[in-house]
Amino acid sequence: MEWSEPAIVLSVAAFGESDLRTIVLAETHGAWHGLARGGAGRRGAPIWQEGNLINARWVARLPEQLGSISGELVHPAAAIAMADPLALAVLRAACAVAAGALPEREAHRGAFIRLARLLGGIGIAGTALPALVRFELELLRELGYGLDLSSCALSGAAEDLAFVSPRTGRAVARGAAGDWVPRLLKLPAFLLDEDAADDKADLAACRDGLALTGHFLARDAFGARHAPLPTARLDLYDRLTRRLNGDDDAR
């Protein structure tokens, strides 16, 4: 059995002296494990970096086997992100969330496209964080935990949506929130406009977006697996909080 198609490197782990056990995300094959022989060597290391887009080829004698995976580098997102600590933190968080939440060998085309879009623009200032929030929303939707941000759960209004119920995942209008505001999750405005430029979202709105998706990822996507949110995702949120509080070391 074998397949070949573009894929995103989600995770790599040492396996022996020079091989790597990898997880990639392919558009039609989903999250897929494989053994990259020589992946830790001089030629393989630049390819097998989390976040890179590759042309992957997986081969095994039987479908249930781990199999061997090889790849050709298409887009070096990991190397590009190295120039910006925040972009690198976003890349690592996105890959960790995808690797931990997506079931193995199950296609999730929307999540793949969103993640590929995030990684393709990882070097464009100001776009990575909003793209991560949009990716996580799509991931939740594809896993069956989608949020309803179309109208207010209380009034039915489609205007002035500002919050989300942490219980139902439905939007709530500012005027209808009343005394419930302290219990609701903030809904950043950039999520209400699919065509909004991601580089216009400020840092506080991005943190609100990550708090929103993080709540439902932890409760539903990872909660269903009895697993915590990945450390890389928790670290990113902490970095944003410290940066908003004026900590220059969190940049």
Swiss-Prot record:
User: Pfam families, alphabetically?
Assistant: RecO_C (PF02565), RecO_N (PF11967)
Q: Which UniProt keywords apply?
A: DNA damage, DNA recombination, DNA repair
UniProt record, GO biological process = DNA recombination; double-strand break repair
GO cellular component terms listed in the entry, alphabetical order: bacterial nucleoid
Superkingdom of the source?
Bacteria
The family this protein is said to belong to: Belongs to the RecO family.
Function, as annotated, reads:
Involved in DNA repair and RecF pathway recombination.
| Name of the protein this chain belongs to | DNA repair protein RecO
Give the gene that encodes this protein: recO
